[in-house]
């Protein structure tokens, strides 16, 4: 399994970031070819402090090659282009092969 974890930075309007992600960006991501799993959530902390990121998404493919093909596709290009519409504060994209500890 090959995974992408996308961590979105806080911006001037976190509610707008979450709304845009829910209504526009997540549906674009769901169209990526070959995607096996796509989950996301709004970050929080157990003690109520401000979390490091506003939201985090996790996407999975069978292989790195499948992920590369997904981002090279029309759907992938649309998702990347959409980042300028809501993620101006930045997003960290971490790609890796999944290893299980269990």
Spans of features found by a protein language model:
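Macromolecular interaction modules
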Residues: 1-102
């Amino acid at each position: 399994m090959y995974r992408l974890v996308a961590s979105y930075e806080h911006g001037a309007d976190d509610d707008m970031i979450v709304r845009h992600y829910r209504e526009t960006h997540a549906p674009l991501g769901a169209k990526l070819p070959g995607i096996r799993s796509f989950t996301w959530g709004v970050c929080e902390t157990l003690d109520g402090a401000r979390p490091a990121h506003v939201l985090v998404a996790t996407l999975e493919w069978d292989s790195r090659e499948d992920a590369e093909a997904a981002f090279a596709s029309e759907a992938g290009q649309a998702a990347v282009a959409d980042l300028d519409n809501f993620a101006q504060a930045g997003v960290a994209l971490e790609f890796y092969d999944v290893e299980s500890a269990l």
